[in-house]
From Swiss-Prot:
GO molecular function ontology, one term from the record: zinc ion binding
Gene: rnz
Residue positions of the active site: D65
Official protein name in the record: Ribonuclease Z
Cofactor: Zn(2+)
Keyword list, A-Z: Endonuclease, Hydrolase, Metal-binding, Nuclease, tRNA processing, Zinc
Temperature dependence: Optimum temperature is 50 degrees Celsius.
Amino acid sequence: MIEVIFLGTGGIKPTPERNVPSIAIRIGSEIVLFDVGEGTLRQMEIAGLNPMRIKRIFITHFHGDHYLGLAAIIQTMNLWDRRETLHIYGPENSGEFISNFLKSGYFAPGFDVVVHEITGKARLQFENYEIWTFEVSHGIPALGYVFKEKDRRGNFDLEKIKSLGLTPGPWMKELEKRKIIKIGERVIRLSEVTGPKKRGAKVVYTGDTEPIDDIVEFSKRADLLIHEATYISSEHRKDSYHTTIEEAYEMFKSSKARHLALFHRAPRYSYQEYAVAAKELCPEAYVPRDFDRVFVGGMGNVIFKVR
């Protein structure tokens, strides 16, 4: 099970009620950060999250409300004597923007910051999870992200063990470590004595975008779809590259994702006004506040902890 922490749920600019976009996903001891709007470091402090646990940051696009908090996080890591490389991922031109950002002021990090530019669809493999990327429609280079926890092995199956003429013992620990061992003259594979794999959690974050088909495609079987829904109505949206509540709901229904969180609310709306509209337009949707936490397991096991 992974933990999703909403550090900032609003869009465009901070308000007294909410900060600009940032989402942390905790998997084991690691924190994976998606977008770093201004004030994200403060939000992490309030949420009790240690920025030194961050190995990777994924930025959807380079509008200020999605990345201006990056410098504060990097400078704090430096103050705390970080030595581990920090990896930052984003759309084309990320390297230039981040390089310029880090050159401003009298500061240089004492650790490596490696920027990875991604164009289009990619599938990035890490120890316990994968990140899938897809381009979204926001008028500038912009990405959506899928966080996919890797599937876990099934439990040891005593019936399968007995059918091979074996009894439970220390060999099981060795098999779990090595995946294949030899007992006597027989080769035993882990898959032979365990049940079905347990599907890992899948969370999709669209970033800022108009509705596009790839959101539906990449959100299939998602446990949680975090979809931007900046505006209540198309009248408010006008010609901006954003999504309304109803459009986000249509994406959700088409994808058959299990849960929907509406994200990036425009500052013109209070939480109450927006939540009432969301309940009328898409009753299944969840409207997170800053510091809400969602625990996500595979197979649709989702627990919402609202503040």
